Amino acid sequence: MTLRLESLKPNKGARRRKLRKGRGIAAGQGASCGFGMRGQKSRSGRPTRPGFEGGQMPLYRRVPKLKHFTLVNPKSFTVLNVSALNEIKAGSTVNLDSLVKDGIVTSPKSPLKILGNGELKAKLTVQAAAFTASARAKIEAAGGTCEVLD
């Protein structure tokens, strides 16, 4: 027999018949239907909604609404302004390694990002992970180029 979509059946015992509660004592789930004698959990309209704490102000309403969320994996950069690049001689290539060697950056823990504060007079080829729009405009206005590293 080939396996066809219309011939599929669930495994034996995989689908149980729905238990009909409250249909007489002999049915096994009659009278109180397994809900106990009294109390909120035995009443009609049960169960209570998730987060319900018996009438007291629930936790999700007690805590303040937060206006923002923190990123799980935030990107961190070693930032450097365009004005700091004036110390480097014109025509050279600037990257994180050369900045550490020149002593401009002291602790290179993360990729380099160039910010646009200040003015740039020298023509440089700058290699960095990210540039702000103003930094890119100032480097290119001075005759230099921006190379984005991955």
Swiss-Prot record:
SS bonds (residue pairs): none
GO terms, biological process? translation
> Per its record, what are the GO molecular function terms?
rRNA binding; structural constituent of ribosome
Q: Spans of biased composition, class Basic residues? A: 12-23
**Pfam families with a match to the protein in the record:** Ribosomal_L27A
Q: Locate the region Disordered.
A: 1-57
On whether rRNA-binding is a keyword of this UniProt record, the answer is yes
Q: Which UniProt keywords apply?
A: Ribonucleoprotein, Ribosomal protein, RNA-binding, rRNA-binding
Gene3D superfamilies (alphabetical): 3.100.10.10
Q: Where is the composition biased (Gly residues)?
A: 25-37
InterPro entries associated with the record? Ribosomal_uL15, Ribosomal_uL15/eL18, Ribosomal_uL15/eL18_sf, Ribosomal_uL15_bac-type, Ribosomal_uL15_CS
SUBUNIT field: Part of the 50S ribosomal subunit.
Report the NCBIfam families cross-referenced here: rplO_bact
Q: What does this protein do?
A: Binds to the 23S rRNA.
The UniProt family comment states: Belongs to the universal ribosomal protein uL15 family.
What name appears for this protein in its UniProt entry? Answer: Large ribosomal subunit protein uL15
Origin organism of this chain? Synechococcus sp. (strain CC9311)
Query: Source gene?
Result: rplO
